[in-house]
Structures are given as C-alpha cells and as structure tokens.
Amino acid sequence: MAKCQICGKGPASGKNVSHSNRRTNRWFRPNLQKVRVLREDGTVKRMWVCTDCLSAGKIKRYVSKSVEA
C-alpha cells in the first residue's frame, strides 16, 4: 500500500516546523485509494492508486452493474 501502482508515487520525508522554529521529522504520505481497475485485456484488478492519477484519468475505473429490484 505504500506506493501508487500507476505512477509510483510513495511517501516523502520532511520536517514539521513549529512557531519557535523547532524541527521534527515527519512523512508526507500520498492519498492512495483502493480501486477496481478495468485492464486492457478485459480483466478487473484491485489496485492502490493515488488521487492525482484518478483525477487525471490515467486509469479506467471498473463499475459493476447493479441489479435493480
């Protein structure tokens, strides 16, 4: 779950900086979503994808056909 399986974006390290300018280490984690992706061969696979790739339309999301009662 640590990386986007489309673009490879992963956690980046940085610093928290307080008002008194003290610095502590922290992680900037990507916003990953577990989505069902429709692949080119017609199969469906669950993948961890960052929201940047989702909003850019880099993947085609699979939507199951719901049965109406």
Swiss-Prot record:
Alphabetical list of Gene3D superfamilies matching this protein: Ribosomal protein L28/L24
GO molecular function terms attached to this record: structural constituent of ribosome
Keywords: Ribonucleoprotein, Ribosomal protein
Region feature Disordered, mapped onto this chain: 1-21
GO cellular component: ribonucleoprotein complex; ribosome
TM ranges: none
GO process annotations (BP): translation
Any Pfam family hit: Ribosomal_L28
HAMAP family to which the protein is assigned, alphabetical: Ribosomal_bL28
Family recorded in the similarity comment: Belongs to the bacterial ribosomal protein bL28 family.
PANTHER family with a match to the protein in the record: 50S RIBOSOMAL PROTEIN L28 (PTHR39080), LARGE RIBOSOMAL SUBUNIT PROTEIN BL28A (PTHR39080:SF1)
Protein name: Large ribosomal subunit protein bL28
UniProt gene name: rpmB
